[in-house]
């Protein structure tokens, strides 16, 4: 489990990206790189890192489900993810 402070920091970055998205898009279309440079560093979506919604783990993230591979395996084994079954052939 990730520390709460790390999860909160990531949520704060996400909020900053969303707040400046429209302004950032307008500056990019206008080619105003000086204006882009004046935006906060955390306003760039490149600085975001996907994290598991349940544990906050940053690695092994599965975009389709929003959780990491370890949590996915546990939930899938318990039948808690609809439509997911174990492979058998």
From Swiss-Prot:
Gene Ontology biological process terms, A to Z: translation
UniProt GO cellular component terms: cytoplasm; small ribosomal subunit
Protein name per UniProt: Small ribosomal subunit protein uS14
Taxonomic path: Bacteria, Pseudomonadati, Bacteroidota, Cytophagia, Cytophagales
Gene (UniProt): rpsN
Any GO MF annotation of the entry: structural constituent of ribosome
Domain of life, per lineage: Bacteria
Keywords: Ribonucleoprotein, Ribosomal protein, RNA-binding, rRNA-binding
Subunit structure: Part of the 30S ribosomal subunit. Contacts proteins S3 and S10.
Family matches, as HAMAP family: Ribosomal_uS14_1
Keyword flag Ribonucleoprotein: yes
Family matches, as PANTHER family: 30S RIBOSOMAL PROTEIN S14, SMALL RIBOSOMAL SUBUNIT PROTEIN US14M
Family classification: Belongs to the universal ribosomal protein uS14 family.
Keyword set includes Nucleus: no
Purpose of the protein: Binds 16S rRNA, required for the assembly of 30S particles and may also be responsible for determining the conformation of the 16S rRNA at the A site.
Species per Swiss-Prot/TrEMBL record: Cytophaga hutchinsonii (strain ATCC 33406 / DSM 1761 / CIP 103989 / NBRC 15051 / NCIMB 9469 / D465)
Pfam families listed in its UniProt record: Ribosomal_S14
Gene3D superfamilies (alphabetical): 30s Ribosomal Protein S14, Chain N
């Amino acid at each position: 489990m990730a520390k709460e402070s790390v999860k909160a920091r990531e949520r704060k970055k996400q909020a900053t990206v969303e707040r400046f998205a429209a302004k950032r898009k307008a500056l990019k279309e206008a080619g105003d790189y000086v204006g882009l440079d004046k935006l906060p560093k955390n306003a760039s979506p490149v600085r975001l890192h996907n994290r598991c919604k349940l544990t906050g783990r940053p690695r092994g993230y599965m975009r389709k489900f929003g959780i990491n591979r370890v949590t996915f395996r546990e939930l899938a084994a318990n039948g808690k993810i609809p439509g997911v079954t174990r492979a058998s052939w």
